[in-house]
UniProtKB/Swiss-Prot annotation:
Cross-referenced CDD domains: C2_PLC_like (cd00275), PH_PLC_delta (cd13363)
Listed name of the protein: 1-phosphatidylinositol 4,5-bisphosphate phosphodiesterase delta-4
One biological process term in Gene Ontology: intracellular signal transduction
Active site residues per record: 312, 357
Species whose genome carries this gene: Sus scrofa
Binding residues for Ca(2+) 1: 154, 156, 158, 160, 165
Organism classification: Eukaryota, Metazoa, Chordata, Craniata, Vertebrata
Region Substrate binding: start-end pairs: 33-60
Binding residues for Ca(2+) 5: 715-717
Sites where the protein binds Ca(2+) 3: 313, 342, 344, 391
Start and end residues of each C2 domain: 619-746
Domain EF-hand: 141-176, 177-212, 213-244
Amino acid sequence: MASLLQGLSASPGSGLPINQDLLLMQKGMLMRKVRSKSWKKLRYYRLQDDGMTVWHARQAGGRAKPSFSISDVETVRGGHESELLRNLAEEFPLEQGFTIVFHGRRSNLDLVANSVEEAQVWMQGLQLLVDFVTNMDQQERLDQWLSDWFQRGDKNQDGRMSFGEVQRLLHLMNVEMDQEHAFQLFQTADTSQSGTLEGEEFVEFYKSLTKRAEVQELFENFSSDGQKLTLLEFVDFLQEEQKEGERASDLALELIDRHEPSDSGKLRHVLSLDGFLSYLCSKDGDIFNPTCLPIYQDMTQPLNHYFINSSHNTYLVGDQLCGQSSVEGYIRALKRGCRCVEVDIWDGPNGEPVVYHGHTLTSRIPFKDVVAAIAQYAFQTSDYPVILSLENHCSWEQQEMIAHHLTEILGEQLLSTTLDGQLPTQLPSPEELRRKILVKGKKLRTLEEDLEEEEEEPEESELEGEQEAELELEAQFESEPQELSPRSKDKKKKVKAILCPALSALVVYLKAVSFYSFAHSREHYRFYEISSFSEAKAKSLIKESGNEFVQHNTWQLSRVYPGGLRTDSSNYNPQEFWNAGCQMVAMNMQTAGLEMDLCDGLFRQNAGCGYVLKPDFLRDAQSSFHPERPISPSKAQTLLIQVISGQQLPKVDDSKEGSIVDPLVRVEIFGVRPDTARQETSYVENNGFNPYWGQTLCFRVLVPELALLRFVVKDYDWKSRNDFVGQYTLPWNCMQQGYRHIHLLSKDGISLHPASIFVHICIREGIEGVES
């Protein structure tokens, strides 16, 4: 068992060659940690010998504490990409600064080195380690995980572990074990009889801890000799249990080649118990169907036929009143596959518009910085179109600057006219709009008028009259959502701000209009117009006119946004709006929790491209579907989930050394109202390492096409609310049957490898007599 650095600096074939940057990082360097213009402090940073963690101290030789793990790092950026470091460019050369970007919602770490050379050492060294960790295979990740635990358990850092150190480590690893049994395993692993465990001996000790009786029993059920699975036996398992069907024979050969550790086993086309376990724990044995991982849906249908991953107040990385506005909000949203971002624009100093949450204490960022970030990151995760939802509060002059920045910075990426210059009859498809950025906002004229032959420019007074007739800035109809009626519109105070023609012209397929009624929309609106709904208004429409809302969303786009009282940036449940076919259900992406788990779960499929094709009954203009009262269709199904066991569940609170989790598993179904249900297992006392439940849960689902499953592991507490341990959410239609592992994620959606739960999934057609 080698540490990462040993792997990096060893002989060829063991990883990366010896690297001077990493050796210098191990010696440590004094750098300046920057949080704001007023908070800049010297810290001594050092890469630990394990090659996986960076510690810091106030000075060289001072008391050090962990700063971050390499596995937590997503990427490293140069100083010129940090808005904070750019603001300090007069104080520190940008070339000496760099930013460490973490997975999830953890704040970036901005550092300034003493020289350009030292900054390069850390930037290059860190990125080298990040790339190495990212490309680790399943076994390498497990080896590194074991190495991390060995480092934590080896208190005196002498490279060996006494039985006392092993006992402490077992508590850290969530293992409650009889001392006599633990000592017996310890002695068996101590082949050198030194009274301590060294690297490979510790690995053997770990293997004895992690023997999976339930997997061995399953293996022996299909193995004639209990030692191996022949090719035919493995094919039987894949067909009978894993429901792999006709492809089982070819798949069996692939899986043996991929997972059987012995070369002789591969040659004989047999699978050992170790190979069988490797298969079950790998992506091949995952609950998420691999056929749903790439782009597998039809991407040539009109935009309104898709659910679109959408963000609310994208610029905020905190709450709605005092939170920080940052281009980082856009970068994070786009990199996680978001395809619709919101830009709230106000007049700024020196003629430059700014982005912030108006009439609040949130900080302000230049609009041009936001556009530059969007230009850079729009298509790093997905090639499919990005929608800029503009909330325009600016004067005529600064609107011209908005149009200028959009045109100049986005260039060819910006869609400024219809695709072929002709009047379309429906919205274009994501495929047709690849790598294009669309503007959603108010528009002075219709698309038909825009596409007419060149006419004499209208007088400004005509524009103002036209504006008064039809324009209300988006801010007005979003802050006072669609309780308007055509009559009450006249009583409403007019907004006299004039929309700049240059900005209006950039709105092509997504003209924002106020919603009055479904009948009004059918009579007066066109397919390229889009209405926004507050969550309260959308809920009311679903309840009162659910089928009309579904039909409305078959020909026009709808955007739903969180209510104004959510000042803490909390989220609503997006599922009820997806049930009505609403395409753009905007989420506060900076806030983790159940609601974002559902959003991440839906958009996990289709390569995470941000577009998911709606079910056929949400695309049919004559659909009779009502999300509140779905008639039981022929596609109704019954789900049987046997929750078998858990593996290496993390501690809820690392500060409580003696505490061990009492895990239970809750399975939740989200979909149409009759399908929404939850059930949970009993809890297992004092065992987060390898708990066993062996309990079966049963659900009936009327509309599986809309259902999401969320698996949650909780730490039972009889005195208070159960603590969250981990979760995983996926669409019903992406679930694989059979014996599957569910690899858990943190609240922030980060892998908790190797934490997982082992289940058996069985789906039966039709409704069986079960209560859920």
